[in-house]
């Protein structure tokens, strides 16, 4: 401790070092980015491919499977899932945490290139990829509305200009434009007119394609001039296509307008987007996995004036949803909680020391330690988030402990009449080892967290490092700045036989005297205390098994996301009506601020909604209570279901599900999967522990199955290719030509006019031109009958997959739900060919459950090793660790009392308690050992004296930690659901520990001392003289 004496005698140097630490911390604070939580996003890449008109089964077998085989060879792929629907396939690749997203993207592109030769012809474009997770909620949604512009024209402007500009902003991973599609020339064929003119659909398609070409024509030049050749080889509008000659009938020209309606429309008319009951185009912006959400949103907002300047006056651009306000509000709440904790801790010190000068010392030490931590956070690449700021809030109680122990011991010597500088030296020397032991053993608690892998390890690393750095800085400050300030600011007082008995002092003396009396009784009834101690151990085990558990507290981010699932045979027009009905119900709720939604595309019977709630200060209900209220109203809507879930800052996996948690069924037999999935889903829907049970297996869509008579076809001179081409031309929204414009490329889309395809009778009007040029009706060589068909085909890996999604009813924990699912699967007797496992957040929860006890045991073992090294003893660390069972009981009972499940945040609280409560024992054991060595006291006398002498600092440090955590319990507002479990755990553990360990620790100390002496006598051998 001589090294630290230099700081006492060199106050200027000490003050300047503390000022340097503070200035570095302030600079680091200003540079730190802001985020809701530490960066825990898995690198995710989405691969998309399309083949218009292809059935889901065709897309799965001919497009998804070749791509999956190639993509599955990429190193670092954690999970690969795919979903194939009408005309489209989407493959989600989730990589390991340590995989660089840009390197993964290069590998994905190489795998797509390798699979290209295996993909079917007729695909309008090569498969593409995006570095974004489609299951993540957008960080911002912009809407475009107009009274005069068509939806197609709005969509074109949004995708061609706005989306391109936004995508260039740092942090933006994907800009998904919804609500319509690109403009196109649509050719709606009249089957009867074609038949009358003897024109086949293929002939129409070929005529349009041939009439709209873009080829280089070259140039002509002479000795002086050069002329570039330009022709009118392109048709760009519906008016230009209408007079196009497609056929000659008996020498008379048949024009396209004679047999079809040609209109300027959109590529896919089966798309609709809305915002607050108005048709709208939605720009859904998602961030890159490694991007900071606040910085990305700020970048978008900074770009908005430029975007609005380039928008025509007829278009209205609005922000429909922004994730950043609730994040900022949550962080502001944590910062306020931190300030309150510092104030309360300093108040505790003042009440105990009853001196303004003495209180000023920890009032300086605490901010220096906390502010200095910001510099280390910046150097480590951390952010200001809920967890790191909660770590600093909790650190308030820790960093003041070191200063209190040093200050209180110096003050004791000053009260005995010692001179200030001498008291500072002597007091620091006496407790220096104690402070080092307390700090190192506390940091040791977090070593297992730093070594923990996966998402929980990544999530908790910033918390552990931030708290460890704060404790380290506090250790240095308490042994340098604190004794220096004590030596130069405090004054010695005359020795008093009786302490002053005023106010808190009188109460403290009374408590100390009462404690001494009760401790004497306890030391005479050690067996009873031993039974109590063993009872706390047993109660810990029982409570841990019984308490409900979850992965992460359910957050209220002020944003809800909803998935609509309608009858599988619903039409687009009916589905658009359902979207409007659902939006009206939600918009009428008093807690809702804004509603946007869209439907259409390859999945006509589904839709998505994004709901922004009013700020927490303007509504009384939580997000979950609002969902529960809306669920009752939404259930009355026939023919469709809307599943709502609160958007969370942590969402694991790339599956887009209609609920927060998923259970995935896998099978190598698609038939077995389709047989068992409805049975399992029905059984799970009946469980009271689950809500909103739904599945992505949609195999009950309406299909018209055409059966060709191949013999008749051969006799009539028709081949299968011609028949299939007929159907694709008629009903597949076939893209038959491309219109090239300076800003974009647009399609010519051909199909039978919707007026002539209202029902199945449209097939009777279809005909094929055979080899002899005769029109042969489709009914001559084909029969059709209705059947069921899948609307989507899903894979995981290379196996058929079906994901059952579910939410949790209010009051139900994730552990109760997973146990009920596992029990149900066992009771159903599902065959081995169908395998079930949790996925996404539920899967991470299962993995975390398996490692929680290991983590706690590892933390205790690490603390034991550190204490054993410091004390050079196998026994004394056990005495110190005997404080833990009572703290565990208090923490678990408090969680039960507040109806809070045991989550990852509560686990942090348990880990913190391991570090906090042992401080009391360390102070007792240190003084007892010193009294035995230097004072010649018996173990009983030594531990009794140590308990009385250290009663005041024990009460001060415990109350400081208690008041440091109390604002977390009492906090409300944004983000309180994250803070409260941590505060509840710590406060409950501290209260119970303080009540019991003041008595159990001396009893355990004496027990191990007797045990040690007994073994020493047994192992001692008489000395034999030779």
Swiss-Prot record:
InterPro entries: AcrB_DN_DC_subdom, Acrflvin-R, Multidrug-R_MdtC. It is a multi-pass membrane protein. It holds the Pfam family ACR_tran. It is found in: Cell inner membrane. Its main location: membrane. The keyword Magnesium does not apply. The chain crosses the membrane at residues 15-35, 333-353, 360-380, 387-407, 431-451, 463-483, 528-548, 853-873, 897-917, 953-973, 984-1004. It comes from the Bacteria. The keyword ATP-binding does not apply. Keywords: Cell inner membrane, Cell membrane, Membrane, Transmembrane, Transmembrane helix, Transport. GO terms for cellular component: plasma membrane. One of its GO terms (molecular function) is xenobiotic transmembrane transporter activity. HAMAP family: MdtC. Belongs to the resistance-nodulation-cell division (RND) (TC 2.A.6) family. MdtC subfamily. Part of a tripartite efflux system composed of MdtA, MdtB and MdtC. MdtC forms a heteromultimer with MdtB. This is Multidrug resistance protein MdtC.
